């Protein structure tokens, strides 16, 4: 806000509920009085044309009636008014009024009055042009270097420039690549038209090029210019300013140079005649209008810029010289001379506030009213203060919105069918030996109040597929209940990383102050059964990957834990069970009779995750039903980092292959386009010439492009499958670390946030660099051992790494720090060095040795610790025996 406001010299309000824009204001000696005094010409969208000759307003008075010289209703909306030499045979000034479908040129004349009411003014129509296209704006000037007269150029809404040589129509040209009209100005020194296109670039067109270009009475003829006579319309120069322009002004510096001023949405540009930037000013506000004018200082330019904050800024080049406050938002600003008072600033608002003002030091003072003094009752103030503090404390505990109120607005519940669909809803699945089942999920929504824009979105982990994942609801009255049902099935022949789905409901709750509603989100999770992606199978005697989970309770019959996978013919096999995933992998689960342990084994490491997680969940549910509260699971084996690193390397290799294929495809595409251009040149040549096997080269390149595109698509499919397996292995690794170190729920959440940051894996932002940055941050903060490690600078950019050695080293170091008693936390004191407490019976690992070890030996570190000693070998059992000794 400026300290000084514009000093009001004369002001008035035009009409009632009329609208105005930047082209509706013009200052000139329109009646050719010869005294050098300007008149204010204002046109409105309601069709009114007014001409004012303002006089100084006495203190306490308002504008006089004689200030309004003329007011006439033209019936059609007035888009723009200009004054120039528009009539042939005379150099007198005339008024041009642009309507949407008509251009009218008037002469304004005054008759001296014989009475005290003043002079009488009238306008006379000299000529008019009916336009075939809807006009947008216009400009005028001595086009082509003519002397003593001005020509008019009108820009239509569809991009046609129509040139009128006073009483006659000259020609029309369409601007190339036109989309939306922009501001238009004429530069007399270069004899060119300057505009800003929809491509957000300033474009200059020579008048001579426009005049000699092919005539364009129809827009379709622009495509036929190559076949007809005449020249193509080409641009003289362009400059990309990166934003839309509000207005353009041409200001002559001297006889040999002029400047092009462009007012953008956020910047103010001054350009040379050839399109080079003379200077640019970044604006910290939203401008509404501007006007360059001659500066008192030699070689500088002053510019008035109005904005939507009721301010008018005066710049000398790029330096702010003055800021003044206006009573309205100006949409047009001019500088004129009235009755020997030069430099009067005339502003017009969009609702018709017309003001003539000048700059001065008239401060806008505000005097606060006196406050009635009264005696204070400190006892009552103490009681009120305690009540307010209690309210603030309650709000802090509940959050910005009370949780109970959020839950009461909309209740969302999900129920999964206990049985598979009798008729599978699976469609477009990959061919396989097994029939793909589906299961129905029902989502129920119940609202308490009226809600708007209610949208339900469901998400499941790929390759699980939904028959429908988007639903909309109309809760126009309170206490409505709506339900939707959909089916879930496995679309691809590999295993998902999770069986948990998420239903998210977004809605808006209208209030008295906000009828559009306050946006809110409610979500509900549901768990799909294991039998959706798994079938009963034969137990396997041997497997490449094995895990053993310890418990503190007696072993439970697997037939009781997994009744939906029990085989009636094998009732005696209560301690062994086989699973066959729909992707083809087999998993075997064994229970020991005496050692309170369970073993899970499979040929693929990532396939162990779902069965292991399902086993722990069903064991917890089993003992909860029995009322046992102290049940717990643990893991005392080796952390399988080597198997995990193999999956990381496979996923990273697919990412590198995808990047190489994309680069190769880009090269082949460039080659393909180059061959096309060569062929096109040969075909256009009037003299036939041999193709020199360009057609064969084009066909071969096309086949290479198609083959590379197919290879990229195949690699993306393999990458999706690899990422799903990597997420499964990551879930399993987090589970084993949690059981191994007995991590709390908060610590497990930190691990999940570090290892599983992405739902989707892309070339721009991949899993490896994201996880590496997260683990490096944990090692630097809560798991750091010294201040030296805290001083390490982490990379601010996430780029695809050259290899996975750094990531694997960080994961190994993370497990080692946890083994030494490191604590995961993200509080403010997390950066403090943690005291590494080594558990009893554990041999510490020297940090220097850890850093120097090779990658091949890094995963064997944990086998040297006593708390990670290899479990005693379990005797192999047959699938029929199923008993662990």
Curated annotation (Swiss-Prot):
Positions in coiled-coil regions: none
InterPro entries assigned to the protein according to its UniProt record, in alphabetical order: PHTB1_GAE_dom (IPR028074), PHTB1_N_dom (IPR028073), PTHB1 (IPR026511), PTHB1_CtH_dom (IPR055364), PTHB1_hp_dom (IPR055363), PTHB1_pf_dom (IPR055362)
Site (Critical for protein stability): 141
Seven-bladed beta-propeller: region residues: 1-406
GO CC terms in record: BBSome; centriolar satellite; ciliary basal body; ciliary membrane; ciliary transition zone; cilium; cytosol; membrane
Main location: membrane
Locations listed in the record: Cell projection, Cilium membrane; Cytoplasm; Cytoplasm, Cytoskeleton, Microtubule organizing center, Centrosome, Centriolar satellite
Keywords, in A-Z order: Cell membrane, Cell projection, Cilium, Cilium biogenesis/degradation, Cytoplasm, Cytoskeleton, Membrane, Protein transport, Transport
Region spans: Interaction with LZTL1: 684-764
Keyword Transferase recorded: no
Alphabetized Pfam families for the sequence: PHTB1_N (PF14727), PTHB1_CtH (PF23339), PTHB1_GAE (PF14728), PTHB1_hp (PF23338), PTHB1_pf (PF23337)
One GO process term, biological-process aspect: fat cell differentiation
Assembly and oligomerization: Part of BBSome complex, that contains BBS1, BBS2, BBS4, BBS5, BBS7, BBS8/TTC8, BBS9 and BBIP10. Interacts with LZTL1; the interaction mediates the association of LZTL1 with the BBsome complex and regulates BBSome ciliary trafficking.
Role of this protein: The BBSome complex is thought to function as a coat complex required for sorting of specific membrane proteins to the primary cilia. The BBSome complex is required for ciliogenesis but is dispensable for centriolar satellite function. This ciliogenic function is mediated in part by the Rab8 GDP/GTP exchange factor, which localizes to the basal body and contacts the BBSome. Rab8(GTP) enters the primary cilium and promotes extension of the ciliary membrane.
Protein known as: Protein PTHB1
Organism: Mus musculus (Mouse)
Gene name for this UniProt entry: Bbs9
